Each structure stands twice: as C-alpha cells, then as structure tokens.
Design a protein with these regions (language model features):
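Mature extracytoplasmic domains of secretory-pathway proteins
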Residues: 26-47
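N-terminal low-complexity, intrinsically disordered segments
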Residues: 1-32, 54, 58-66
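Short, flexible helical or helix-coil boundary motifs
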Residues: 19-23, 40, 44, 56, ...
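Amphipathic alpha-helical binding modules
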Residues: 53-92
Length: 92
C-alpha cells in the first residue's frame, strides 16, 4: 500500500470512528432503529462525499470517473452538496 492509499484509508477510518461515536451518543433519542441507521448511513455517505470533494483533508480530492463512459460525475459540483436532496435523514 502506498502513502496516498494509507491517507485515504486513514480518513475512512476517522469517518467510521466519528459515525460510531456520534450514533452511540444519540442512540437513546431514537424511537426506531431505522431512524438511527438512516442517520448513521447519511453521515457516513456525506463525510465520504466531503472527502472526495476535498473538504476533509488538504491532501485529498478526487474525481469520480465512470470508467464505462469516461464521465466525471463530480465535474463542476460538490457531491456532498447533493446529499440532502437525495438521501434520507432525521432531524434528531
């Protein structure tokens, strides 16, 4: 594994640790497990999109390329800006 790959996976680990810690701290506020899981997955996806967009670590910013078409799906947009429109989360 090269240094850039280590940085990538370390950042994913930070995201995972944050999501676990946050969800454990708020677990009692949820009436349904589905709502808790919805928020955990939303947070993780949002933070991964932030990482791709270059907002979580100054050393990381990526283009997401569809290798079949060659199109860059994050061309001229920030992926994390679209999470709220497409993904579910609660107000807890």
């Amino acid at each position: 594994m090269n240094e850039e790959q280590r940085i990538f996976y370390n950042e994913l680990r930070k995201i995972q640790d944050f999501a676990i810690g946050t969800s454990l701290g708020k677990q009692s506020k949820y009436k349904k497990i589905e709502d808790l899981l919805e928020d955990i997955t939303y947070d993780v996806i949002y933070m991964i999109c932030e990482m791709i967009d270059g907002y979580r670590n100054d050393l990381l910013q990526y283009d997401v390329v569809n290798v079949k078409s060659g199109n860059v799906i994050n061309d001229k947009i920030a992926l994390h800006d679209w999470c709220e429109e497409y993904l579910k989360c609660t107000d807890i």
